[in-house]
């Protein structure tokens, strides 16, 4: 069975709330801004709403989402304060209860096992309230399902309850149910079943859930690649690229498949496509390795230099590796 980890899923779960009739998705504009990493605009919009109404539940909840999304541990205490303020001012608000549950999960990730044990029951109860207040709040539903899957039984975990949450969602939206069932199957190590469910899910209209879709497709494709099942891996990376053309992970994965099969020219082409979407250091590092294997010294040097100059920076160990490769190439 593949390892399961709360930290693996939570950062990519929906950054928005749904409301309205079944099969209809309505996303708050601030949630969309946070999802799109337009943090400055999101912050300005939150401030404007709170200036009009200091207890606006959507704005207070979005301020929690924004602090979590920035990924700075120092912001989590203030996010917790914002979440508690949201709940205190709006005790029957689903988005406020959800926001507080989300920051509890973020603190559990940052604080490790001790923090998770300390927050577990309060997190579960808070997310359950969010669903009780609004059964159409799919982010809270998916987040609670992940909690049930990851937490041990004595801390409130329950695989049975996780599947029940997915089944309950079927009355509201079958495609989100397929995503949730895929996540459950993956958690149980049933990769074929997970693949079947995720490929059957049409999440085109669900912009804010596509992070979960991406991570699951990416992990399934990578599992095939690690096992040497290149055709299956390539098929899933192609699907990832088709469904999420704005993500670099599709072409990057296809490059890894081509590289594993010795098709270095194709690997380089796919890496160039990935870098055009997201010029991240890890892509340039891999591109440098491919060009070096192709004995293309100038392109390898350029790629390695881009890897060292990019942000977010490579891990220290990877920086040392790239620096060593670069020095060797320059000596030739």
Could you describe each region identified by the protein language model?
Residues 22-69, 77, 81, 95:
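N-terminal leader/linker segments that initiate helical-solenoid repeat arrays
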Residues 146, 210-228, 235-274:
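Alpha-helical adaptor scaffolds
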Residues 62-65, 99, 143, 180, ...:
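Canonical tetratricopeptide repeat
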Residues 36, 70-73, 107, 151, ...:
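Structural motif corresponding to the intra-repeat A-B loop/turn of tetratricopeptide repeats
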């Amino acid at each position: 069975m593949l390892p399961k980890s709360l930290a693996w899923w939570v950062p990519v779960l929906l950054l928005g709330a749904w409301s309205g009739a079944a099969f209809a998705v309505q996303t708050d504009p601030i949630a969309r801004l946070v999802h799109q990493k337009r943090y400055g605009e999101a912050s300005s919009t939150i401030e404007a709403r709170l200036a009009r109404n200091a207890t606006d539940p959507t704005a207070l909840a979005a301020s929690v989402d924004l602090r979590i999304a920035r990924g700075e541990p120092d912001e989590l205490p203030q996010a917790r304060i914002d979440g508690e303020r949201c709940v205190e001012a709006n005790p029957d608000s689903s988005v406020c209860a959800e926001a507080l549950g989300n920051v509890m999960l973020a603190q559990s990730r940052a604080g490790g096992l001790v923090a998770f044990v300390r927050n577990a029951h309060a997190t579960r109860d808070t997310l359950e309230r969010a669903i009780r207040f609004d059964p159409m709040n799919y982010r809270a539903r998916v987040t609670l399902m992940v909690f049930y899957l990851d937490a041990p039984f004595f801390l409130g975990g329950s695989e049975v309850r996780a599947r029940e949450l997915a089944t309950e969602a079927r009355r509201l939206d079958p495609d989100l149910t397929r995503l949730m069932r895929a996540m459950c199957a993956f958690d149980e190590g049933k990769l074929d079943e997970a693949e079947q469910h995720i490929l059957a899910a049409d999440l085109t209209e669900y912009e804010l859930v596509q992070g979960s879709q991406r991570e699951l497709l990416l992990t399934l494709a990578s599992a095939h690649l690690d096992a040497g099942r290149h055709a299956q891996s390539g098929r899933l990376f192609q699907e990832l690229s088709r469904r999420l053309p704005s993500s670099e992970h599709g072409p990057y994965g296809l490059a890894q498949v081509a590289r594993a099969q010795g098709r270095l020219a194709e690997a380089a082409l796919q890496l160039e496509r990935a870098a055009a979407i997201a010029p991240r250091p890890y892509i340039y590092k891999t591109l440098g390795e491919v060009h070096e294997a192709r004995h293309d010294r100038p392109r390898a040097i350029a790629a390695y230099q881009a890897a060292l100059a990019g942000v977010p920076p490579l891990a220290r160990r990877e920086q040392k590796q790239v620096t060593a490769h670069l020095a060797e190439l320059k000596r030739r």
